[in-house]
Design a protein with these regions (language model features):
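An aromatic-glycine-centered, glycine-rich loop/turn in mixed alpha/beta architecture
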Residues: 84-183
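Hydrophobic alpha-helix feature that most strongly marks membrane-spanning transmembrane helices
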Residues: 4, 50, 54, 98-102, ...
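Surface-exposed interaction regions enriched in Ser/Thr/Asp/Glu
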Residues: 30, 194-198, 206-298
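Carbohydrate-recognition loop of C-type lectin domains
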Residues: 1-108
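Structural flexibility/helix-modulation signal
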Residues: 166-213
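Short, glycine-/Ser/Thr-/acidic-enriched flexible segments
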Residues: 16, 31-34, 76-80, 142, ...
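Short beta-strands and strand-coil junctions in structured, solvent-facing domains, enriched
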Residues: 34-36, 79-84, 104, 123, ...
Length: 298
């Protein structure tokens, strides 16, 4: 084996990238240790591959690019068939989700299959009656501070846009963590207008006020986001910790998430929301379904 520490490998022609590069075969390698490969290790692999090179085609080793899946799950259970508390069931569900993430995902060829995940949740305990689990996906980019730059972020999965102008007033299907731009002390965020435009805004008394309604574009069919001439001065903390990245979160068109080329899909279990509640219908407190509420699937 040329690199025995490889846990997962993906290879494709450079001509298949968003910006085609001919004469190159790209090889994505995820190390078993979980860390990215050093430049020295990458060059060593390239050297070992030289005897296998075809004509003028050269190999290039690239690091995996992570797409995080965020879950919001509402689970209903029958209190009369278990002595377990909702907290205990929640803990067991999180364990099942974590095991799925570790054992099935985090490889180049591993698709997040939504029905498999929801089935695992249902099978955690016989008292569980149903779960409504919604999906968002997240990527990040690292801005060059105090420099006007163009950024391309590739989800490589279609994102939800059932009609032109979808959810325009509420920010479309794109959200971001905060940052400040050069020349302003206002914390800025990104959303979309449902018509392919990425907008930059700040909050004034909780209301979105747009600084730039054409900060970039979003391609709903393939999840490509382009940010034009964005001059980031500083980056806001994320979940209470200092950050060097800006996170972008979108609603996918499909609940199944596919890793493409150098992508690896993983569940962000820590930042997913799991709510376990007693089902009132089977518990006897609902009257022929009157007053029974369901959770939105969207």
């Amino acid at each position: 084996s040329i690199y025995p520490n490889a846990l997962s490998v993906s290879a494709w022609g450079g001509e298949d990238d968003e910006t085609p590069r001919y004469g190159i075969v790209k090889i994505g390698i995820k190390a078993a240790s979980g860390s990215t490969l050093t430049e020295t290790t990458k060059q060593d692999i390239v050297n070992k591959l030289k005897p296998y090179n075809v004509a003028s085609v050269s190999p290039q080793i690239v690091d995996p690019e992570t797409t995080s899946v965020l879950l919001t799950s509402t689970v209903k259970y029958n209190t009369s068939t278990t002595t377990k508390s909702s907290d205990t069931l929640k803990s067991e569900i999180i364990t099942a989700i974590t095991n799925y993430n570790t054992n099935t995902l985090q490889k180049f060829d591993s698709i997040y299959r939504h029905s498999k995940l929801t089935g695992l949740i249902d099978s955690v305990d016989t008292s569980i009656l149903s779960n409504i689990t919604n999906v968002k996906i997240r990527k990040s980019f690292t801005p060059s501070l105090a420099s006007s730059q163009k950024y391309n972020i590739y989800f490589r999965n279609a994102v939800f846009n059932p009609h032109t102008g979808h959810n325009m007033a509420a920010g479309g299907i794109l959200s971001s963590t905060g940052f400040k731009v050069t020349g302003s002390d206002l914390e800025q965020f990104l959303d979309d207008d449902g018509s392919g435009n990425v907008r930059r805004y700040y909050l004034a008394s909780g209301i979105r006020t747009y600084s730039n309604e054409t900060q970039g574009t979003i391609n709903y069919s393939n999840g490509e986001i382009t940010l034009n001439s964005l001059n980031v001065a500083s980056i806001s903390n994320i979940r209470g910790a200092t950050s060097t990245v800006v996170e972008l979160t979108v609603t996918p068109d499909s609940n199944d998430i596919v890793p493409v080329r150098d992508q690896i899909v993983e569940l962000d279990v820590a930042n997913s929301g799991i709510t376990v509640t007693a089902d009132t219908f089977v518990g006897g407190s609902a009257d022929a379904g009157v007053g029974y509420t369901t959770t939105s699937s969207y």
